[in-house]
Curated annotation (Swiss-Prot):
Amino-acid positions noted as binding Ca(2+) 1 in the UniProt annotation, renumbered to this chain: 69, 71, 73
Co-factor binding comment: Binds 2 calcium ions per subunit.
Cellular component annotations (GO), alphabetically ordered: extracellular region
Gene that specifies this protein: LnP
Name of the protein in question: Low-redox potential peroxidase
Lineage of source species: Eukaryota, Fungi, Dikarya, Basidiomycota, Agaricomycotina
Binding positions (heme b): 178
Note in the entry: In comparison to other ligninolytic peroxidases, lacks a Mn(2+)-oxidation site (as in manganese peroxidases (MnP) and versatile peroxidase (VP)) and an exposed tryptophan responsible for high redox-potential substrate oxidation (as in lignin peroxidase (LiP) and VP).
Natural source organism: Taiwanofungus camphoratus
Reactions this protein catalyses: 2 a phenolic donor + H2O2 = 2 a phenolic radical donor + 2 H2O
Length: 330
């Protein structure tokens, strides 16, 4: 399957950003409505996620802020939304999810959110996301040009996210999806390039490494969507580098370094807000989502890197003490 900047979880993150209205979630569980998702789970794990692998080609999606709506409009109106530049590379994932949704007679919006929660559950260290079912099908495509790109300045990114009800802290937390991400389309010369050194683990290594001084481009590309990376074979998005160093977000970014529980909680809360915007009276089927494998190892400097390589942009609090290690886990 063709892959791009984000794994599937990022696809879900950005599919939900610009659908806003009041949220009224049900606290009850409907056995009939939830039980069908056990069958969906089994098929996704076997046929999409390769028996529960975290890093799989089937998990990857596109661009930094691509996507349609949490109502599944990107699937319902694929012919329209897949033409948007921000959705480059999503074609195969969109049509794959359409196949599964049609086969199980569930809505496209529900399928996007469920598959994202299941995908994340396969990654050690990730939070267990809640899943609410009952989204109706979309009745119109998402408008174009709603979501920012990796080439956009931080102010524009934060402004767009604020329009959707997400503050700067939410934005930084949602970027945790990049801890289990790879790119293919920004620089096709280096397919499957990870955005940190632990792409199979949902951890805070991404937040540390994005603050390390960039020294090289990993491939042949020198486009405006990427910045120099600190490690061979590691890719860095220009927007990630900018958000990590911006005065509005630098301290929030730094706060997640070696703070696994803090990141898990912040990401989970932001995803609940994102996944359920624009819908009411959804049914709680969270019990169907598997419990992710644990991961509690501390963050480490990659081989050859140390505190002197950090470009600290938050002056309010000291930088956390990080151990040196020549073998970062993958």
């Amino acid at each position: 399957m063709r892959s791009s900047t984000h794994i599937f979880v990022s696809f879900v993150v950005y599919c939900g950003v610009f659908v806003t209205s009041a949220i009224a979630l049900s606290n009850h569980t409907n056995a009939y409505q939830c039980d069908r998702w056990s069958n969906v789970l089994n098929e996704l794990q076997a046929n999409l996620f390769h028996e529960g692998q975290c890093r799989s080609a089937a998990l990857r999606a596109s661009g930094t802020f691509g996507g349609g709506g949490a109502d599944g409009s990107i699937i319902q109106f694929a012919h329209t939304e897949l033409a948007y530049p921000a959705n480059e590379g999503l074609e195969e994932m969109v049509y794959t999810l359409k196949h599964f949704a049609d086969g199980h007679e569930v809505s496209y919006g529900d399928m996007i959110q469920f598959a994202g929660a299941v995908a994340l559950s396969n990654c050690p260290g990730s939070p267990r996301l809640r899943f609410y079912a009952g989204r109706p099908e979309a009745i119109a495509p998402s408008p174009p040009n709603l979501l920012p790109l990796p080439t956009d300045p931080v102010e524009k990114i934060l402004s767009r996210m604020a329009d959707a009800g997400f503050n700067a802290g939410d934005t930084v937390a949602l970027l945790a999806a990049h801890s289990i991400a790879v790119q293919n389309t920004i620089d096709p010369s280096i397919p499957d390039s990870p955005l940190d050194s632990t792409p199979r683990i949902f951890d805070t290594q991404f937040y540390l490494e994005t603050l390390l001084r960039g020294t090289r481009y990993p491939g042949k590309g020198r486009g405006p969507a990427q910045s120099k990376s600190p490690i061979e074979h590691e890719f860095r998005l220009a927007s990630d580098a900018a958000i990590a160093r911006h005065t509005s977000t630098a301290c929030e970014w730094q706060s997640f370094i070696d703070n696994q529980e803090g990141l898990r909680s912040a990401f989970r809360n932001a995803m609940v807000k994102l996944a359920n915007q624009g819908h009411d009276n959804l049914v709680d089927c969270s019990f169907v989502i598997p419990v992710p494998p644990p991961w509690n190892l501390p963050v480490e400097y990659p081989s050859g890197k140390s505190r002197s390589d950090v470009e600290q942009s938050c002056s309010d609090v000291p930088f956390p003490t990080i151990s040196l290690n020549s073998d970062v886990h993958d």
